[in-house]
Structure formats: C-alpha cells, structure tokens
C-alpha cells in the first residue's frame, strides 16, 4: 500500500484538494477536486486525473457549510473512498510566511499563532489558508501538517530588491518586499528545466496572470525580482486589486474622503483592479468579449502595466532569454499573450500566431531572440513535493512518517 499526501488550498468560499500517491521517487496524482460554495450551497466534486467524476455531493443551502465542517466532510470522504489510512501528511498552501519562514514548516499550535500574525499582510488569503490547518490539528493532531509558503521562493533576491527606502528600524521589523506566487514560479522554473534547459539556466521572466497577477524575474532557477512586494496588492492591476499605487493617494483618501483603514483596504483589495476600471467585471474573459469602453480600457491598462514591468524586470536581469505565460489568463488568453508579445518586440520577442492560438508549449518563432512558452502551473504538485521532502528530512526511523501512518490508521 502506497503512502499518500493530501494537498489543501483554501480560499474564501472553497477548499481545493489534491491527493498524490508515492510511486518510487515520484508522486502520482490520484484525485483532485474542491468543496465550493461554502457558507451558501456547498458542493463537493472529486475527479480522477483523467477528469472522470469520482464523487459529487451537494449540501442544502440552509446548512451554510463553513471551512471547518467542509474539512470534516472531506476527511470522511477520503477515509471512505480512497484508503486514507495511507495518508502520511497534509500540505497546505499558505500565502505569507513573513521573514521567519523561508521554507516549508511543520505546523503546531505555536507556529499557527505566528502565521496568524501575518493575516494583516494578506487579508484575502491568509485567514482562509489557516482555517483547514487549525481544523486538522484538532481532528488529527498526530498527522503532520506542513505549511508551504508563496513567499519562500523569493528569498534568493538580492537585498536591494527586497528593500523599501524606509528607515532601517522598519526594515528590521519586517517591512520589506516579500513577493508572492512563489510556489507557481518554483514549479515553472522546475518544468522549464525539462522543456528548455538553455532558457532555464538563463534569464527568464514568468508571467503568472490570473485573478491575482504578478511577474517574476528568474535567473538559473532563482528569483531575482518580482512585481509584488509587502502585500499581494502591489504590482499589476488584478481582478479586484489595484496593483501599484502612489502612497499619497491613500493619505489623500483618508484626509479628504474620510476613509479609515478598513475603507481603504476594501477599496484596494475588493473594488479596484479590472473591476474598478471597467465597471463591468473582474473576469478577464468577460472583459475581452465586451464592447464596453470601460472593459476595453481595463484590458489596455492590464497589458500596458505588463509592458512596463517586462522592461523593469529585463533590466534587473541584464537582458532576457525567455518569457513564460502561466495561470488562468496567461495559459488561456491568446489575445493577452499576443498584445503583450507585440509590445515586447523591442526585446526580440516574436511569436507564431498559430502556436499562440493553440496555447501550449513554445509559441515563439524559430527566429525569435527570446523563447516564449505557455506552461500551465501546478502549485499543488509543488506543495506535495515540499511536504514529502520535509517529512523525509525531519524524521527518524520511528519518526514523523511512522507517527502519521499510525494516526491515519486509527482515524
């Protein structure tokens, strides 16, 4: 019987899950799915790697299933349907590890308390990321819970790339540029090594374009600079997040529009970005297909900001060898890729129209000085690998894995 690792990625209204089985030195996906519609009409959907339906269940809306109850049902489902006695650990995506956690960590109540102090730095994500950990610690305390952070990958950046021009005491207090989407960038860097070793060992800019969007300059697999900083609201305009903003705007809003910190937070995180500019939608698919002038303006601003950040990140790399598009928009919006690459012709970018329309693999021409790739990300697999490696490196012959097997068997 093979060991299994469960990966959880909790959002505000859903818990996404993936189960991986050990196959020698590799991890094979066994199932994936989510419980969506939390606090409304919750629904569990589980699928096999070939996308065939494994299980489906809907709860009455009046139950208003929350994160804790959803995780209870998920654990029950795993135990009943996928031999959960093999489960040796749970890996969790956690957006912010601060300056304290620069790699995966096994979470206990003490670590959980520290992670809760980072909630103000990632208010849209961190509270929901931590809820399943808290529930799992209470229900299966002997089963290892491993937190994997979106901030860790960026700790290889030079000091100047992580600094704000603020007094040293504030920097020492942890006010710095952390960067995010690190699990995605780490996966892309690893995958690019397999697909294009020359590009992977050179200077690459990865565009993680989704409802949350950022860009990262990577050299020889290491983060050099990124567009997100202290929080995940900086950088590119996103679905509902503003992206870069003159701090003076915030002071002005507070002084002249009587906005308090909660008002400003709500504005920057939930009312701005593509939604705020367009007045139509936060969904890029809707905006691309809309004739509304506001929608067209939002798309134009999104591409313009990417154009500026490409130049900035290419400068940080002293040149450019490859561009990779990933995440929901990056992997599925040929129009955005075409506009971005058209604006990057000065860097030596030239894409093949047919390859771009197909949207998989290398989409640049044979004569392009910069290789351009479309690579779907897989943060869940990255978390599973980190979890297994952490358990392997932090065990004795009678250590964590044996405890986990014993705990899972008796759960």
Give residue spans per PLM region.
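Short glycine-rich, Thr/Ser-proximal phosphate-binding strand/loop in the N-terminal lobe
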Residues: 5-7, 14-63
């Amino acid at each position: 019987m093979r060991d299994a690792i469960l990966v959880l990625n909790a959002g505000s209204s859903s818990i996404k899950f993936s189960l991986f089985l050990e196959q020698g030195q590799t991890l094979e996906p066994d199932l994936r799915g989510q419980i969506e519609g939390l606090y409304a009409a919750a629904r569990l959907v589980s699928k096999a790697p070939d996308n065939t339906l494994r299980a489906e269940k809907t709860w009455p809306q009046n139950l208003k299933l929350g994160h804790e109850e959803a995780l209870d049902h998920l654990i029950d489902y795993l135990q009943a349907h996928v031999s959960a006695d093999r489960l040796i650990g749970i890996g969790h995506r956690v957006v912010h590890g601060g300056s304290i956690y620069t790699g995966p960590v096994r979470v206990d109540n003490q670590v959980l308390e520290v992670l809760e102090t980072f909630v103000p730095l990632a208010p849209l994500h961190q509270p929901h990321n931590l809820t399943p950990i808290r529930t799992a610690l209470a229900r299966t305390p002997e089963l290892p819970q491993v937190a994997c952070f979106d901030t860790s990958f960026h700790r290889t950046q030079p000091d100047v790339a992580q600094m704000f021009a603020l007094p040293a005491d504030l920097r020492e207090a942890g006010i710095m540029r952390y960067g995010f989407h690190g699990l995605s960038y780490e996966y892309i860097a690893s995958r690019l090594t397999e697909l294009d070793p020359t590009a992977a060992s050179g200077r690459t800019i990865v565009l993680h374009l989704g409802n949350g969007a950022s860009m990262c300059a990577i050299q020889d697999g290491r983060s050099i600079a990124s567009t997100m900083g202290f929080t995940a609201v900086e950088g590119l305009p996103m679905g509902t997040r503003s992206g870069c903003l003159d701090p003076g705007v915030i002071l002005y809003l507070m002084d002249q529009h009587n906005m308090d910190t909660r008002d400003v937070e709500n504005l920057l995180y939930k009312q701005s970005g593509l939604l705020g500019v367009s007045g139509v939608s936060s969904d890029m698919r809707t905006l691309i297909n809309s004739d509304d002038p506001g929608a067209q303006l939002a798309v134009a601003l999104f591409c313009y900001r990417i154009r500026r950040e490409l130049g900035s990140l290419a400068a940080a790399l002293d040149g450019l060898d490859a561009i990779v598009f990933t995440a929901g928009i990056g992997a599925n919006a040929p129009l955005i890729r075409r506009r971005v690459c058209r604006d990057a012709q000065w860097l030596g970018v030239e894409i093949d129209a047919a390859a771009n329309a197909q949207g998989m693999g290398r989409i640049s021409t044979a004569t392009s000085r910069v290789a351009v790739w479309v690579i779907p990300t897989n943060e869940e697999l990255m978390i599973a690998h980190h979890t297994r490696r952490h358990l392997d490196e932090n065990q004795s012959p009678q250590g964590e894995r044996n405890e986990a097997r014993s705990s899972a068997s008796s759960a």
